[in-house]
Regions:
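Surface-exposed coil/turn segments at beta-strand junctions on protein surfaces, enriched
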Residues: 18, 68, 92-96, 127, ...
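Short tryptophan-centered beta-strand motifs in secreted/extracellular beta-sheet-rich domains
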Residues: 25, 97-106, 110-114
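Flexible glycan-contacting loops in extracellular carbohydrate-active proteins
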Residues: 122-155
């Protein structure tokens, strides 16, 4: 998956999610995920997650990420609960290393983990009857400063 220079996200159509089954992806952050955008460097980019009807800025859960000056990728639980935005740093991962990211909705909680890294978080967001897959998004307010490639394979 490539986010092109000057954009926030690749072109994609919304995908509905049926049931409460886990989302699993093998994710590899490539060296192109290193970037410098000045004062907005602390903004959190989005990787994948679940948005609930009517809008993901009401209730949603996503893995977030940003490049760290220590040459790692900071990973976040990034979510909206009843229209209020929250985020919590849950760990760091290296570049050019495949990781399995899992999001498991269950009742009013979503468990987020990265296998083999000891990274784990529980996010309290209530689901609605209708849900849709949220894909990669660069930003905050800034667009991608160059092509950003993240290798993503749904498992």
């Amino acid at each position: 998956m490539i986010i092109k220079t000057g954009t926030h996200a690749p072109m994609r159509w919304p995908k509905l999610i049926y049931g409460m089954s886990p989302l699993r992806y093998e994710i590899t952050f490539t060296p192109s995920c290193a970037y410098y955008i000045g004062a907005d460097q602390a903004d959190i980019n989005k990787l994948f997650g679940i948005g609930y009807w009517p809008h993901h800025q009401d209730n949603s859960v996503r893995f977030g990420w940003r490049y760290s000056s220590s040459n790692y990728i900071d990973i976040f639980a990034y979510f909206y609960k009843d229209g209020e935005r929250f985020w919590q740093m849950i760990g760091k991962v290296g570049m050019n290393i495949p990781y399995t990211f899992i999001m498991m909705p269950s009742g009013h909680n979503h468990t987020m983990q990265i296998l083999g890294r000891g990274i784990h978080a529980v996010v309290p967001v209530k689901p609605s009857k209708f849900a849709y897959l949220l894909g990669p998004y660069f930003g905050g307010n800034k667009v991608a400063p160059h092509d950003i490639e993240i290798k993503m394979t749904r498992l």
